[in-house]
Each structure stands twice: as structure tokens, then as C-alpha cells.
């Protein structure tokens, strides 16, 4: 779930920040350099809010990711675990469908949270047509994480053909299909 989206320009001074929840982990992404003092302040705010809403005894788990060139030049890690832990394997559920995610590796976590409405549409479309005479066939021309394909199959599509950008996507698709008992 997208918790905060500063890049939309609705929060002046916060345009560089995005906060996503991949339960039980929060991922804070900055598109501009962030100082340790800023991260400490944000971490304290997250901890304060988490202590108010968390199930009893549940620790705050959060990761910071900087998506900018300055991090590579300075030699600092692009992605850092700031508090708690990240499960391995890390599996999240959206609308009853399970996905394996990787919040400590690169920019592609395995599920683009801002595409949830699109996945709902694909699910509803596939479910409504799953009993058609010939069955629904889906061509996914941008199968980056295969999440749309998993949703289509889960909703009753007869066949999905994926076009991948990289070989790694095949492994992601296979893991997600297995998690959802899809052959």
C-alpha cells in the first residue's frame, strides 16, 4: 500500500519522499539526497506513530532507499535497513493474491504498489470473462514483475503470454504462481 506520495506535488517540501508498506516492512524512498539527521527525524516519527497503531509487541521494520546518483558517488549503500528486520522470504498479499517481494534489492521490489487499481481492473475483467466459450487469453507486453499475469490467472484467465524485459522476471512469475497454486 502506498502510504505517502510526495512526488504528486501536493505536499510542498516533500516532493522527494514516497512511503510504501510491504507488510511487515515500510520502505521510505527519497529521490533526493537525505541527511542522517533527516532520516533520524523521520525514523523517530515512524516509531512514534507505529507505537500507537502496531499490534502489541510488533516491532517497526523500515528500509530507506535513495534513488539518485549522489549515493553512488559518495559510496554509500543505495538501500539500507534502518530498523527491525525484513522477512526472508518476504511475501505480501493484495486482494487475496500473494506476491514475493524484495525490498532490500534494487528499485524493483517485485510489486508496483501504484498499479493496484490496474491489477483490480484486470482481475475484474478476467473474472467476468472466465466462463466465455473460448476462455480469456491475455497478452502481457510489459511483464516486468508478472503481477498482472498472476492476477489474470487467479481470476480465471485460460492462458497468459508474457513478454519479459529480463530473464529475472521469469523467476518472479514462477515464484508468484507457486505462492498462488497456479500451474
Model regions and ranges:
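Polybasic, low-complexity RNA-engagement segments
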Residues: 1-40
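A structural signal for short, well-ordered beta-strand segments and their strand-loop junctions
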Residues: 2, 61-65, 140
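Non-catalytic substrate-recognition/targeting regions of SAM-dependent transferases
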Residues: 7, 12-13, 18-20, 42-116, ...
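Hydrophobic (often cysteine-bearing) scaffold residues that line and stabilize catalytic clefts
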Residues: 38-39, 114, 169
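Conserved SAM/SAH cofactor-binding pocket of Class I
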Residues: 123-183
Amino acid at each position: 500500500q502506498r502510504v505517502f506520495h510526495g512526488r504528486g506535488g501536493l505536499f510542498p517540501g516533500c516532493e522527494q519522499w514516497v512511503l510504501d508498506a510491504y507488510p511487515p516492512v515500510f520502505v521510505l524512498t527519497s529521490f533526493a539526497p537525505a541527511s542522517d539527521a533527516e532520516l533520524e527525524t523521520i525514523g523517530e516519527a515512524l516509531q512514534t506513530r507505529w507505537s500507537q497503531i502496531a499490534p502489541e509487541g510488533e516491532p517497526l521494520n523500515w528500509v530507506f532507499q535513495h534513488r539518485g546518483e549522489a549515493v553512488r558517488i559518495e559510496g554509500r549503500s543505495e538501500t539500507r535497513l534502518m530498523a527491525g528486520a525484513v522477512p526472508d522470504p518476504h511475501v505480501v498479499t493484495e486482494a487475496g493474491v500473494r506476491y514475493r517481494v524484495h525490498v532490500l534489492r534494487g528499485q524493483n521490489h517485485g510489486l508496483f504498489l501504484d498499479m493496484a487499481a490496474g491489477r483490480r481492473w484486470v482481475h475484474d475483467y478476467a473474472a467476468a470473462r472466465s466462463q466465455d466459450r473460448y476462455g480469456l487469453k491475455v497478452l502481457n507486453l510489459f511483464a516486468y514483475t508478472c503481477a498482472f499475469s498472476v492476477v489474470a490467472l487467479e481470476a480465471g484467465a485460460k492462458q497468459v503470454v508474457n513478454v519479459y524485459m529480463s530473464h529475472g522476471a521469469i523467476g518472479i512469475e514462477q515464484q508468484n504462481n507457486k505462492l498462488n497454486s497456479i500451474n
